[in-house]
Structure formats: C-alpha cells, structure tokens
C-alpha cells in the first residue's frame, strides 16, 4: 500500500456510540439508549483518539485513546452530521480565535478579549482561546483575571501538548514578567511532570525559582538542564552569572560546566 493510500485509510471524522442508561426510579425505572458523538482521529502509528462533542458541536474536553478493534466495533461514522453541524462550527470557532489573535498581536487588547470570550462561550476548554485570553490579561497587567485563566489552564493536560508550545512559552514568560512567580513555578512543575527530560523547561523553571530567591532549586534545575544538554549556552551563562555574583555554594562553584567561548 502506498503512503498516500495509507493516509487516506486513516480514521478521522465524527462518529457516534450508543449505551444503555437507566432513566427514572422505582416503578418508573426504565432503560433507554443514549447516543454520544465523538471526533475521532488516527495518527501515523495507528493510535486512535476520541474526543466528545460539546452541545455547540465542537470537540471539547479530554481526549482518550481507544483500541482500534473496540472503535470499529462500537463507533459508527456520521459523515452527514459532520458536514452539516460539526465542520461549520469548528470553522467558525477557528475564525473567531484567529480574529482574536490578530487583535492581540496588533495591541487591540479589548477587542481581543471580546473575541476570545466569544470563542470560550462555544468551547470553554479551548486551549488556544484560554491561552490567548490569559496573555491578553497579562499584557494589560490584570494579574487577577490572568490568575483565573492560569488556574483553568493548569488543570488541562492539553495545555502542555507540543502543538501549543509557542503559546505555552509566551504564557510562562508573561507570568514571570508580571511577577506571578508562584504561578510560574507551579506552571513549569506541571509541565515537567509530563516532560521531565526537556532541558528548556528545566531552564525556565530555574528562572522562575531564581525570581523567588530559591537559589538551591535554581541550581538544581540548571544542572539538570545541562545534564540533558551540555551545550545549552543560556544555562551555562546563568550559572556563570551565579558564580560571578558568589551565589553558588562553595562546594559547587568549581564543579559546574564552564561557559564556552
């Protein structure tokens, strides 16, 4: 089978599943069939993930992997439902978010806030919209509102997925710029739970710890970053800064990697 045929064979679209649920109580108790709609996507390795559709016909909430055999047996394709309801809703949502992002980039933060709010009314768990609204608040210095978004983002694992890396980095930097150091530490700690071998996360955590005057943790994360990538110049320069300012413990001051010329 050719690569093109392989791509065409992958599962992607809206599917439905049915399950029997109890309705009522006592003498009125009965069973009925409940239909659920899902957005399914199969990756290059053949792993299928499903995500429920919310009442506004957009995929929302946590994704879950499902064995292919179970999927094929219990989920039915709904191409007409996708074309008539889901695709138009997803397209409109993405257009709203794109419009909001343009406003934010252009410095029109109040229009950005309005459009991100519109997007979140359609999908309150949309990662791009939550990041965008949070960044809008941070850029305005509205730390109270930004903290509300932070508390929402920190609970959603999709926040830390690779596809959102650029937004993730911007948000972390802006937390520090707004002196929200406790949130920045919690933010990077959550990310490190999911990606413990990411040297850049350890470096950013070191920056956040240093802002909190936690030198011990700063050094710990810098050393971890360099153990993962000994060529990480920004981490070497940070250690050199600590050394020059006599912030390294005496036992470590001569043992750290030197900054290369």
Short names for language-model regions:
Residues 1-101, 105-118, 122, 145:
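Long, contiguous interaction/recruitment modules in multidomain scaffold/adaptor proteins
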Residues 93, 127-128, 161-165, 199-200, ...:
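Helix-start (N-cap) detector for alpha-helical repeat units in TPR-like alpha-solenoids
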Residues 104, 138, 169, 173-176, ...:
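Position-specific recognition of the canonical hydrophobic site in helix A of tetratricopeptide repeat
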């Amino acid at each position: 089978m050719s690569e093109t045929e392989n791509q065409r064979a992958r599962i992607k679209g809206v599917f439905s599943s049915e399950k029997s649920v109890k309705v009522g109580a006592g003498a009125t108790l009965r069973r009925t069939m409940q239909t659920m709609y899902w957005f399914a996507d199969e990756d290059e390795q053949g792993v299928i993930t499903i995500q429920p559709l919310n009442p506004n016909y957009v995929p929302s909430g946590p994704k879950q992997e499902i064995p292919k055999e179970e999927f094929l047996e219990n989920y039915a394709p709904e191409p007409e439902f996708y074309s008539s309801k889901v695709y138009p809703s997803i397209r409109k949502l993405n257009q709203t978010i794109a419009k909001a992002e343009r406003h934010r980039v252009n410095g029109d933060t109040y229009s950005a806030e309005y459009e991100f709010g519109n997007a979140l009314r359609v999908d309150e768990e949309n990662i791009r919209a939550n990041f965008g609204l949070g960044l809008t608040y941070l850029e305005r210095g509205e730390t109270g509102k930004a903290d509300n978004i932070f508390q929402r983002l920190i609970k959603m694992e999709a926040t830390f997925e690779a596809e959102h890396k650029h937004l993730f980095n911007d948000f972390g930097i802006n937390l520090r710029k707004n002196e929200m150091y406790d949130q920045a530490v919690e933010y990077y700690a959550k990310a490190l739970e999911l990606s413990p071998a990411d040297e850049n996360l350890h470096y950013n955590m070191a920056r956040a710890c240093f802002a909190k005057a936690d030198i011990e943790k700063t050094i710990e994360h810098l050393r971890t970053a360099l153990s993962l990538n000994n060529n990480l110049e920004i981490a070497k320069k940070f250690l050199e800064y600590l050394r020059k300012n006599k912030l390294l413990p005496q036992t470590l001051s001569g043992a750290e990697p030197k900054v290369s010329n």
